[in-house]
A protein has these predicted regions:
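Catalytic palm active-site di-aspartate
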Residues: 15-16, 167
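Non-heme Fe(II)-dependent double-stranded beta-helix
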Residues: 1-14, 20-124
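Catalytic core of non-heme Fe(II) oxygenases with the double-stranded beta-helix
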Residues: 104-164
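A structural signal for short, well-ordered beta-strand segments
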Residues: 94-97, 133-135, 193
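Short hydrophobic-aromatic micro-motifs
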Residues: 18-19, 133-135, 170-172
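Short, charged/polar surface micro-motifs in flexible loops or helix N-caps
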Residues: 77, 102-105, 140-142, 169, ...
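Catalytic core of Fe(II)/2-oxoglutarate
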Residues: 145, 155-193
Length: 193
């Protein structure tokens, strides 16, 4: 799905942009296949295995799976990054997978990601030129630990919960405050990148 200039203006105004249904169904299913076979099993298999991971637990890019590699370097995501940064000279700093299961604690304090993959001291925000993203590969409900994003200039209490259909993506600045939330549902999983 092409990300429009209007959507990118929203990103620059609020510090993040949630794009629902960014991935096609085939791209979403291919990414889930990669996660469930190379990183972490789906909830049912995880519980049947006494909450043990029976995969290779390959969490970092590059993956030996075309579906995961494709979504990491998705042409429309790369295009949006180039337009945000104003250059085709972009670098992927990190790609990693995450899995949250029912019954585990996941809540974090609100924080920024500046400092991850950065050697220097904290600097003033620079017009959102340090871009990060979250993919949600399965549907995320309020019960399945949605990521909480805080719009620029707002207090943490005014967060936006990333309750989205599977295949959605959130672009955000490393200066955008955000936090994990608890998985309050009694079953299920939330795979993310």
């Amino acid at each position: 799905m092409h990300i429009t200039d209007e959507q990118l203006a929203t990103y620059k105004k609020q510090g993040f942009l949630i794009v629902e249904n960014f991935l096609s169904k085939a791209e979403q299913e291919a990414a889930l296949d990669g996660i469930f076979n190379h990183f972490a099993p789906p909830y049912e298999r995880w519980t049947a295995n006494n909450q043990e991971n029976d995969t290779a637990n390959q969490g970092l890019f590059p993956w030996d799976h075309s579906g995961l590699t494709h979504v990491t370097t998705h042409p429309d995501l790369v295009n949006a990054a180039e337009r945000i940064l104003g250059t085709r000279e972009i670098r992927l700093g990190e790609g990693h997978l995450g899995m949250k299961y029912a019954g585990q604690e996941h809540n974090t304090n609100f924080h920024i990601d500046y400092g991850n993959n950065t050697l220097g001291p904290l600097i003033d925000p620079d017009d959102f030129m340090h871009l990060a993203c979250f993919y949600c590969f399965d549907d995320v409900t309020i019960d399945t630990a949605p990521i909480r994003m805080v719009p620029n200039g707002h207090p943490d209490e005014e967060f936006v919960a990333m309750v989205v259909p599977g295949g959605s993506v959130c672009l955000y600045s490393v200066f955008t405050r955000h936090a994990a939330s608890d998985f309050t549902g009694d079953r299920g999983h939330r795979p993310a990148m």
